[in-house]
UniProtKB/Swiss-Prot annotation:
Belongs to the bacterial ribosomal protein bL19 family. The keyword Ubl conjugation does not apply. This protein is located at the 30S-50S ribosomal subunit interface and may play a role in the structure and function of the aminoacyl-tRNA binding site. One of its GO terms (biological process) is translation. Coiled coil: none annotated. It comes from the Bacteria. GO terms for molecular function: structural constituent of ribosome. This is Large ribosomal subunit protein bL19. InterPro entries: Ribosomal_bL19, Ribosomal_bL19_CS, Ribosomal_bL19_sf, Translation_prot_SH3-like_sf. Keywords: Ribonucleoprotein, Ribosomal protein. Pfam families: Ribosomal_L19 (PF01245). The lineage of its organism: Bacteria, Pseudomonadati, Pseudomonadota, Betaproteobacteria, Burkholderiales. Gene3D superfamilies: 2.30.30.790.
Length: 130
């Protein structure tokens, strides 16, 4: 492992200190809790939407979350290892066949729905036993 890769790995470990980032994929509905600083106050703001893209680049990894707010589509890019991220919660698993869901930008209403990935009972029982 070269020097830059070692430094990046150390920074990732430092950024994850005490935090866990769940496994999520494009199509999943997530709630991203973001630390927002307003003046001298600090609060947590929740941003819920569908993950339309994930970019895995080590320390520079990010993901794009899209939601519909007041009839307008809003996309926000989050750095995966940012200290501003308080937590990420996966609310619903989506069943999609693409890595990038940019086609959802042109769609609205029923055509923008994503099928839910149902987990079999065998897998949930095995996961709970481990």
């Amino acid at each position: 492992m070269n020097l830059i890769a070692k430094l990046e790995q150390e920074e990732i470990e430092r950024a994850l200190a005490g935090k866990t980032i769940p496994e999520f994929a494009p199509g999943d509905t997530v709630i991203v809790n973001v630390n927002v600083v307003e003046g001298n106050r600090k609060r947590v703001q929740a941003y819920e939407g569908v993950v339309i893209a994930i970019r895995s680049r080590g320390l520079n990894s990010n993901f794009i979350v899209r939601k519909i707010s007041s009839g307008e589509g809003v996309e926000r890019t989050f750095q995966t290892y940012s200290p501003l991220l308080a937590s990420i919660v996966v609310k619903r698993r989506g069943d999609v066949r693409r890595a990038k869901l940019y086609y959802l930008r042109e769609r609205s209403g029923k055509s923008a729905r994503i099928k839910e990935k149902l987990v079999s009972k065998d897998r949930t029982a095995a996961a709970s036993q481990e």
